[in-house]
């Protein structure tokens, strides 16, 4: 008796072009939402989910796991639907925003292609702007839980890249100075900082946090940098915003827990969601 081997998920097959999978995902989104193209995309991390309701009219929702290349979210606090939202800008014009509701983390073991599939799908829908958000640990004791911080740069400590082959992308301004200036017009008090991504899923040790600080990091987390790299490769203009949900290990007097991250995100949710919606409408 012979058994049929399980089918290989497209992104796991080295012979598969990940950009073709992203194109298929974009086509599925267009058909499911009735929106031919999107102007911008948002990835809402821990604590940021409420921003979707404040952006504008939800045109359609698509279960994320039904879109080619995506799977259900593995982390509590992350959305499981992808939304197309009609956004009325401050100048009266209308844009369509794609809110990606399922972020894949590197620690899930699905590979780097899966981590950046949402970003490549956003680009395939026509998006020119990408807003990446996350919940993170803070090294600056002046930034208490609930503080939003604009990303000015990042340090990729995953030892991985989403790019394959001789793809040499300039990351000098990976986080758009223009978009950061726009965000400061919405809230001049927003601080800026450098974000360091660790692989996870375990939290950083106090020694690792000290190392990150010596390297120049102000924030530590487990997402965002690989997505930002892929976004720049696709030609997207990127804005990164972190929500400090806790002080990092060795700085915080208490042990870290994911429940703490979710609780801090929920407490800050209304304020940071309104901030993000205001920025997106610009």
From Swiss-Prot:
It comes from the Bacteria. Phosphate binds at residues 46, 78, 103-105, 223. Gene3D superfamilies: Nucleoside phosphorylase domain (3.40.50.1580). A purine D-ribonucleoside binds at residues 204, 246. GO terms for biological process: nucleoside metabolic process. Pfam families: PNP_UDP_1 (PF01048). SUPFAM superfamilies: Purine and uridine phosphorylases. The keyword Glycosyltransferase applies. The purine nucleoside phosphorylases catalyze the phosphorolytic breakdown of the N-glycosidic bond in the beta-(deoxy)ribonucleoside molecules, with the formation of the corresponding free purine bases and pentose-1-phosphate. Cleaves guanosine, inosine, 2'-deoxyguanosine and 2'-deoxyinosine. NCBIfam families: PNPH-PUNA-XAPA, PRK08202.1, PUNP. Homotrimer. Belongs to the PNP/MTAP phosphorylase family. This is Purine nucleoside phosphorylase. It comes from Cellulomonas sp. The lineage of its organism: Bacteria, Bacillati, Actinomycetota, Actinomycetes, Micrococcales. The gene is punA.
């Amino acid at each position: 008796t012979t058994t049929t081997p399980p089918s290989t998920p497209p992104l796991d097959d080295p012979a598969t072009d990940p950009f073709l999978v992203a194109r298929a995902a974009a086509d599925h989104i267009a058909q499911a939402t009735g929106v031919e193209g999107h102007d911008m995309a948002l990835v809402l991390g821990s604590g940021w989910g409420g921003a979707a309701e404040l952006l504008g009219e939800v045109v359609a929702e698509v279960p994320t796991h039904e879109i080619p290349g995506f799977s259900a979210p593995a982390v509590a606090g992350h959305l499981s639907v992808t939304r197309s939202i009609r956004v009325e800008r401050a100048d009266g014009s209308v844009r369509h925003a794609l809110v990606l509701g399922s972020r894949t983390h590197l620690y899930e073991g699905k590979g780097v292609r899966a981590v950046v599939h949402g970003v490549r799908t956003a680009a395939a829908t026509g998006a020119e702007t990408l807003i990446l958000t996350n919940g993170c640990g803070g090294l600056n004791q002046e930034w208490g839980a609930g503080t939003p911080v604009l990303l000015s740069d990042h340090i990729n400590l995953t030892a991985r890249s989403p790019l394959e082959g001789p793809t040499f992308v300039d990351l000098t301004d990976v986080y758009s100075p223009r978009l950061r200036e726009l965000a400061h017009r919405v809230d001049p008090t927003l601080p800026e900082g450098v974000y360091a991504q660790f692989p996870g899923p375990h939290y950083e040790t106090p020694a690792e946090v000290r190392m990150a600080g010596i390297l120049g990091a102000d924030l530590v987390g487990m997402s965002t940098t690989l997505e930002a790299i892929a976004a720049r490769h696709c030609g997207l203009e990127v804005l990164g915003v972190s929500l400090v949900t806790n002080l990092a290990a060795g700085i915080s007097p208490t042990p870290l827990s994911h429940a703490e991250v979710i609780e801090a995100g929920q407490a800050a949710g209304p304020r940071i969601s309104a901030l993000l919606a205001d920025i997106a409408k610009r």
